[in-house]
Amino acid sequence: SEMCIRDRTIYDNRVFDSKGVADPSVEIQFGPNIKDWPEMSALPQNMLLKVVSEIHDPVTTTDELIPSGETSSYRSNPLGLAEFALSRKDPAYVGLAKEVQKAQKAIEAGEDAAEAFPEVKDILETVKESYADVTQDNLGIGSTIFAVKPGDGSAREQAASCQKVLGGWANIANEYATKRYRSNLINWGMLPFTIDKGELPFKNKDYIFVPDVRKAVEDKLTKIPAYVVNEGMKEITLTLGELTDDEREIILKGCLINYYRD
């Protein structure tokens, strides 16, 4: 029979074989929709949270937190995907979260948070009346959502990561629908707070100050004092619940990426 001779030319022209010829100095070229994860800060000593969504449905699904379907093409683009977070449930969420994030970005850049996001100026002054030692050097500013029972449904970690890249530092819930969603929050460096059922001591767009939150995580506290900040400071209790030592370290580092990097 006639011998079949394979022509590798087409394959060689389309596929790069780096075996034995790899050059680490060459920078990988990414397509326009492939983006790196933004840098994520370690857990600050003190934390100021703005509630940017308040959801009282009995259950909030991961598909409501970040819809599937048309968003799938953005899974390689964390910030692009985050634009769709809560879009079907609370369209105002993304804009509010990004406004708050301006303050944290200013802190990380060594700039004035109150200048970047003037709304926090009076809030910080109220905080300093009781906690005079709070400065930008020991403070993080971010967003949180409240939902009665978030995280039911599919296991998509983007339900948590989209909140993180928009400046989310925490969730507050009466309970979490799945251990998986709570674990995803932890892996993205977000505090999985719970609060007792009943009338909420805060509302959407309120600020919550959590003093010494880093020490609370280090010391394995489960009940964490916090304050709703309006004209004054109203004390509330947030529950952190059980965390393994590794989970605490992940939160302290800022996210699982930082945990492995360090």
Feature names for model-found ranges:
Residues S1-E2, R6-D262:
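Fe-S-dependent hydro-lyases/dehydratases of central metabolism
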